[in-house]
Amino acid sequence: MARVWRRAQFTTGGASGAIALIALSPVKLPDPLPVSRKQHGMPDDSENAEAIALVTRDRSEDPAWFVDQVVTPFADLIASDLGPDVAASALATEHAYVIEGEVEDPEDLGHVQAAWALAKCLCEQGATLVVDVYAARAHLGEEVAALAPDRELEVMHEVTLFFDETEAGTLAAWSLGLRKFGRPEIVLLDIAPDKATETALLLRDIAATLVAGERIEPGDGVGVPDGRRLVAERFDPASAPVVSIEGDALVLR
């Protein structure tokens, strides 16, 4: 039986945690799904798991809408993560299974576990890939099917770190996926190219702290290994157009 993922450093007052996964399949999958708490990792001691819902979308119902609204928005992401052949197969898929849920200020992460439990079951039944919408990442179906049902939370499975070059020649770095945990995304700017690895580790560690339940508010300070103290501010997308974030975000300066 899967133990619910609890947040060891949970601090109340956060936002709602939302997750959205889209599983694509070339074939119609069983309804109802043969979901097993033991086999798929569905937690049984979390009310948050009950917030997750599954909706089926079939290409045959409205082919143009299916392509425009379900598949095409993620084609570039799938191609980048999994290659052009997988992206081409995704564009031709016949069925999409949308897993969604939202929990107010989640004290445990049962909603995240439940979503992946459904995705694992779908992939065992024939889904070929899963898009993690808020983390902007695509996973092969065979990899999702292989997820251990009793695994511990792995932050870097749930959160993606991105880097891009700015017009000034420096780097911008940001997270995607913290929305699942009711926390703002984190942005770091004006990074020297030779500090990319160091910055990735810092961003990973900050993300892990937020996933564990800590909060960062505008005006809060965050200590970094080199002794500096960065201060959190609301992120203005116009200040760094290369940063692609929808929703709440903080920049640390």
Where do the language-model regions lie?
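Charge-rich interaction surfaces and accessory domains that mediate macromolecular binding and assembly
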Residues: 2-28, 36-37, 234, 243-245, ...
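Active-site-proximal structural scaffolding
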Residues: 14, 112-115, 199
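Short cationic amphipathic helices and targeting signals
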Residues: 16-26, 96-99, 186-190
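N-terminal low-complexity, intrinsically disordered segments
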Residues: 18, 24-88
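Short acidic, S/G/P-rich loop/turn micro-motifs used as interaction or catalytic elements
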Residues: 28, 103-107, 192-196
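Structural alpha-beta junctions
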Residues: 39-49, 117-131, 208-217
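Internal, hydrophobic cores of structured domains that mediate oligomerization or house catalytic pockets
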Residues: 63-164
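Aromatic/basic-lined ligand-recognition segments
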Residues: 134-253
